[in-house]
């Protein structure tokens, strides 16, 4: 019984620190220093939330840039089901899945001449990736130009405008946020 009191008081102390003080402190500091990020990096148009800059969306029409495939297949880009497909490189199911994605991309992009960028046929680890490389976006230009009656030059400039360089030049690669790019594409039609 002598050891019960210190154990109980340590438990209560740690419960208050880890369950109360720490979450409250991180929430307050996050709201103070990074309010946009702490609230989900929501992209708004007026009072309407159009998406998040952190989570991809399922753009399926020919007039939109398509992102990486979502690993949450039943409900694409569902953050509650986030996670990879867990298929090993040696798994024949992964080969079938990639072959089906390649066939679908070839059918939707018959005018694209180069080989399909790998990120358009492989899901990210989270299954919610919102970024692709500018090269993967450029690969889709012929389909979008045809569907929206836009010039290749207009779409190339749009990709360049929304491309983000890595923080450190030699670590990482440039990326394009698909949600922001497609919202900008919609604004061209207005």
Swiss-Prot record:
What keywords does the record list, in alphabetical order? ATP-binding, Cell inner membrane, Cell membrane, Ion transport, Membrane, Nucleotide-binding, Potassium, Potassium transport, Transmembrane, Transmembrane helix, Transport
Q: Organism's domain of life?
A: Bacteria
TM region(s), chain numbering:
10-30
Query: One Pfam family name from the record?
Result: KdpC
How does the entry describe its membrane topology? Single-pass membrane protein
Gene Ontology, cellular component aspect: plasma membrane
What's the chief localization of this chain? membrane
Name the PANTHER family on file: POTASSIUM-TRANSPORTING ATPASE C CHAIN (PTHR30042), POTASSIUM-TRANSPORTING ATPASE KDPC SUBUNIT (PTHR30042:SF2)
Assembly and oligomerization? The system is composed of three essential subunits: KdpA, KdpB and KdpC.
What is the protein name stated in its UniProt record?
Potassium-transporting ATPase KdpC subunit
Its taxonomic path starts at:
Bacteria, Pseudomonadati, Pseudomonadota, Gammaproteobacteria, Enterobacterales
